[in-house]
Amino acid sequence: MLTLTSYFGFLLAALTITSALFIGLNKIRLI
């Protein structure tokens, strides 16, 4: 259970970071 929780936590963190970087790049392109 612990490994599954940590796996989903890591996946969620990676997705959040990727989304943040993608949005940041889009904002830079718009400016």
From Swiss-Prot:
GO biological process per UniProt: photosynthesis
Localization terms from the record: Plastid, Chloroplast thylakoid membrane
Entry keywords, A to Z: Chloroplast, Electron transport, Membrane, Photosynthesis, Plastid, Thylakoid, Transmembrane, Transmembrane helix, Transport
Molecular-function annotations in GO: electron transporter, transferring electrons within cytochrome b6/f complex of photosystem II activity
UniProt membrane topology term: Single-pass membrane protein
The keyword Electron transport belongs to this UniProt entry's keyword annotation: yes
SUPFAM superfamilies in UniProt: PetL subunit of the cytochrome b6f complex
Spans through the membrane: 4-26
Entry GO CC: chloroplast thylakoid membrane; cytochrome b6f complex
Major site of localization recorded for this protein: plastid
Any Pfam family: PetL
Record function comment: Component of the cytochrome b6-f complex, which mediates electron transfer between photosystem II (PSII) and photosystem I (PSI), cyclic electron flow around PSI, and state transitions. PetL is important for photoautotrophic growth as well as for electron transfer efficiency and stability of the cytochrome b6-f complex.
Subunit architecture: The 4 large subunits of the cytochrome b6-f complex are cytochrome b6, subunit IV (17 kDa polypeptide, PetD), cytochrome f and the Rieske protein, while the 4 small subunits are PetG, PetL, PetM and PetN. The complex functions as a dimer.
Annotated family: Belongs to the PetL family.
HAMAP family in UniProt: Cytb6_f_PetL
Name of the protein in question: Cytochrome b6-f complex subunit 6
Organism: Amaranthus cruentus (Purple amaranth)
Gene: petL
